[in-house]
Amino acid sequence: MLTNPIFYLTNSNTSKASTHSNTNSKSLFNTKREDLQILYKLNQLLIEKSILHPYQRILIAVSGGQDSICLLNILNKLRSTWHWKLGIVHCDHKWYLDSALQAIHVSRLAANMQIDLYQALTTQSVNNEQLARNWRYELIRHVAICHNFSVIVTGHTASDRVETLIYNLIRGSGISGLQSISWKRKLNSMLTIRMRSVEEQIILYSKHVKCYQNRENLLEDKKNVDIYLIRPLLNVSRMELKHLVQNWKLSIWSDCSNQNISICRNRIRHQLLPYLRQYFHPKIDYVLNSCTEVMYTETLYLDSIARYVLSKALSFISMPLNDQTCVKLDFELLRAVPLAIQRRILKYFLDVITHTSVSFKHVEQVRIACLITTNSSNQFAKDSMNFTDQLLINRSIYLPGKKILQVINARFLIICNNIT
């Protein structure tokens, strides 16, 4: 018999918090065993992985669908124990005629739970999923910064993780791409918000809604503020959450686009995965999710090695030549590490200088130009040549982000803007 595993924190200084904890504890034990297991599993995971902490200000991204509504209710049940300050953010892409009703539904949930709500409406229709995702994350990030939330949580599940693994595998992603849905990652600015008036950008639905006071607040990006994206439900399946909705009688807003099989991810969900379960492995979801978790932990380890080696191999040399940046890399050190680490080092370096995610092709171009030498190039490196002569034999590599990387004598990298 489990003893109260959920409410492991106590607050003897505040009788009000203690009362809330006791009340919440009783309500939990009145729920069905399956519900308690999910709460217990999530609570233990938060402790083990240390992805959320007591007394944090947490901003929950809520669409109104099953996964985000379950996440909201779970965190709401745990908030008195962890002493969290919760906030809800909802973004309306105006993809459907009833999207305003969906936003109102979320606002009523926030009012009933007495949680601050931040709602945003796009000013232009964006039909591209990637652009819409970038707009959504950028806006949520600004809300978090302006209202002092340290983390953003989303309702991605183990099922989403498996579908993303298959999707990225089909697209030919590397190991990092295969485990792209991670427990925690830093949310960087994507600069995708088109600035409009506050009235156009934000729609208010209830007294619990807060919004930006002026345009400058939305434009302002506080320096040295790290916002992290947390996905606490990656070990909970979509089916488990479906049972939770039924047991708790939660009101959710179904997304009809999830049934559209013209979308690749939906074909994976509704056609490919059921086929794999029936004809290959009935627990294929669990197997693939376990593989993803193994890749995630191994990637963290390899990335830490790659960044350490890069910090030892990299130095900047200022150059007066057209405001270009000259970078000196210790190519001998890079050649001494395994190929997998070489590629990770160059991938991380190129991502930083281009402010985007470079492809395997670009990584290999730079690696071959910098690290693969011949006898003639070795002899050439020993020759005494001035810098002007070396510029004549440079190799230019065109990168994303309108950057050109010039490799000089396999010793220097010159980074400049592509003005064409």
From Swiss-Prot:
Domain of life, per lineage: Eukaryota
Swiss-Prot/TrEMBL keywords: ATP-binding, Chloroplast, Ligase, Nucleotide-binding, Plastid, tRNA processing
GO cellular component entries: chloroplast
Record-level Gene Ontology MF annotations: ATP binding; tRNA(Ile)-lysidine synthase activity
Domain notes: The N-terminal region contains the highly conserved SGGXDS motif, predicted to be a P-loop motif involved in ATP binding.
NCBIfam families named among the record's database cross-references: lysidine_TilS_N
Protein task: Ligates lysine onto the cytidine present at position 34 of the AUA codon-specific tRNA(Ile) that contains the anticodon CAU, in an ATP-dependent manner. Cytidine is converted to lysidine, thus changing the amino acid specificity of the tRNA from methionine to isoleucine.
Protein name: tRNA(Ile)-lysidine synthase, chloroplastic
Organism: Zygnema circumcarinatum (Green alga)
Species classification: Eukaryota, Viridiplantae, Streptophyta, Zygnematophyceae, Zygnematophycidae
